[in-house]
Regions:
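Short, acidic/polar linear motifs in exposed loop/turn regions
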Residues: 191-195, 210
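C-terminal motif of bacterial Sec signal peptides marking the signal peptidase cleavage site
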Residues: 15-16
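Short, solvent-exposed, Trp/other aromatic-anchored flexible loops in extracytoplasmic proteins
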Residues: 209-277, 286-287
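Short, well-ordered beta-strand segments enriched in hydrophobic/aromatic residues
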Residues: 183-191
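Low-complexity, intrinsically disordered terminal/linker segments enriched in charged
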Residues: 31, 109-167, 223-227, 265-288
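Exposed beta-sheet edge and beta->alpha loop/turn motif
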Residues: 71-145, 193
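Short solvent-exposed beta->alpha transition segments
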Residues: 25-82
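Short, hydrophobic/aromatic beta-strand segments
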Residues: 196-202, 213-218
Length: 288
């Protein structure tokens, strides 16, 4: 009986070691494929990799056998992915790889955690709107959430941008040409919003007598406009000689729009409300 038990334990240990070795090989193969296309496609090892909608990078992956957990036909590999990003900065990410067997008893990666890196703005927005919590998500689930979160953020971005375009207005402006043909002028603008606005930019587009485009010039309004405040600024353009017509427009930087989004109050239920609204719209579309 003791011999049987010992033999059984030995078999289990050997099987576990074998599975760990297979998991290490599979994981290394996957990370190698991220930087070496001749080695294979990432989807050869991680069938749903394309669903993550990322281009992960890897130079070296560090795997310790002690960081591998085997449970029946599932294996969890915790590793460190070392790489240099597009900006030339060295990165080291903690990644978890989830492995199981397919119907042919072949090992494959069915999920991961840590391959997706989140932009700071979208991470902040996700936490404020209730899309991202404190508990980290696995990558496949995170990719699905991020797709919807980006849509919500674009919606909020354009709402904010349109509000700026319509409520920070040009009250009056004029321009003329100097003796050398260069154009210069002045404008008066007003902030009709209940909050301060900074980072206002302007663009002047010049045309000839046939309304053909000649050139454009841009600049920034150096002042932060408080609610209901009016402000005059001047501009000088040297890249259009003797224009006949001109058009002045106000623009707002992405950073300025995002800063205003960050200043808003959020209940933490915006993401779920957006999802519910989307489902209702889909249902109505199907009923038509």
């Amino acid at each position: 009986m003791r011999c049987f038990v010992f033999s059984l334990l030995t078999t289990i240990v050997l099987s576990s070691c074998s599975h760990k070795n297979e998991a290490i090989e599979l994981t290394r193969s996957f990370f190698t494929s991220l930087s070496d296309s001749t080695y294979g496609s990432p989807t050869d090892f991680y069938p749903q990799y394309d669903s993550l909608q990322i281009e992960a990078k890897s130079d070296v992956v560090d795997i310790e056998e002690s960081d591998i957990t085997v449970k029946n036909d599932s294996i969890i590999v915790r590793c460190m992915n070392n790489y240099t990003d597009a900006k030339g900065t060295f990165k080291q990410d903690s990644v978890v790889i989830f492995i199981t067997k397919d119907k042919d008893s072949e090992w494959y990666i069915y999920n991961s955690r840590g391959l997706i890196t989140i932009d700071k703005d979208i991470e902040w927005f996700g936490k404020k709107t209730g899309a991202l919590g404190k508990k980290p998500m696995n990558d496949l689930q995170l990719a699905e959430v991020l797709g919807k979160l980006y849509s919500l953020m674009r919606k909020k971005y354009w709402e904010q941008y349109i509000e700026l375009k319509t409520q920070v207005e040009i009250l009056d402006w004029s321009w003329e040409t100097s003796y050398d043909g260069t154009a210069h002028g002045e404008a008066r603008i007003k902030n009709k919003l209940p909050y301060s606005v900074s980072g206002i930019k302007y663009q002047v587009t010049y045309y000839d007598r046939q309304h053909n485009y000649m050139a454009e010039d841009d600049g920034s309004v150096s002042k932060t406009l408080n609610p209901e405040e009016k402000y005059n600024f001047t501009f000088w353009s040297s890249n259009a000689k003797y224009p006949s017509r001109a058009r002045l427009t106000l623009e707002f930087s992405d950073r300025g729009v995002y800063d205003l989004l960050k200043a808003k109050y959020y209940t933490g239920t915006e993401f779920q409300e957006y999802i519910k609204k989307g489902k209702k719209q889909d249902k109505r579309t199907k009923e038509i």
